[in-house]
Amino acid sequence: MDLKSKIFLIYGPTASGKSNFAIKLAKKIKGEIINADSMQVYKELKILSARPILKSYKNIKHHLYGFKSVKKNFSSGDWLSLVNKKILDIRKRNKTPILVGGTGLYFKAITEGLVNIPNIPIRFRSKIRLLHKKIGAKKFFSELVKLDPVSKNFVKPTDTQRVIRAYEVKLFTKRSIYDWFKSTRSNYDLSLIHI
C-alpha cells in the first residue's frame, strides 16, 4: 500500500479512544494528525471536547486543534479548505495524513465534497435564528415552505438546524439550498476506521 497517497479517517464517539489509536498509527506509518471534530477547533472548549492533552501528542504533529475562538464563524467549508492545505503540506514532507474526529459533516466533506454556498454573514444568520425563536418551530417551517416549497421534500419540520439553514440560504442567495447541492466526490485515497 502506498501510504504517501493514502489518508486515514478515524471516527467514532467522544472519548472512544480515537486519539490514542491515531497516535499509535501515526508512529507506525510516519503520520500526522488532523482534527476532524467541530468542537475541538475551538480554543475555549478543551474539556467539553475530550481534546488530546499536549503531553499525549508524543512527538506526533497535530493540526487544527484549539486554534479558533467560539466568537468567530467557522464553517465546514472553512475546515475543508484548511484540511486540503494541511494534507498537501503533510504529503510534501512524505508523511501520511490521519484525520481524527466525530463530526459527520466534516467526514462527509472530505469523502464527498461540499456545496460551495457563499458565506452568510453572522448578523444575517443571527436575525434568522431570532425569527425562529420568536415565531416558533412550526410557524417558521411554514414560512420556509412558502419561501422555498421544495424544502418540504428534504427537511423535517423538527430538524431545527436544517430548517434554519435552508431558510437562511434561500433568503440570502435567492436559491434553494437543494439547488446548491452537487454530486461531488473526493479525489483522495481514503481508509475509514471506526472506533
Segments predicted by a language model, with ranges:
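Phosphate/pyrophosphate-binding catalytic cores of soluble transferases and nucleic-acid-acting enzymes
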Residues: 1-193
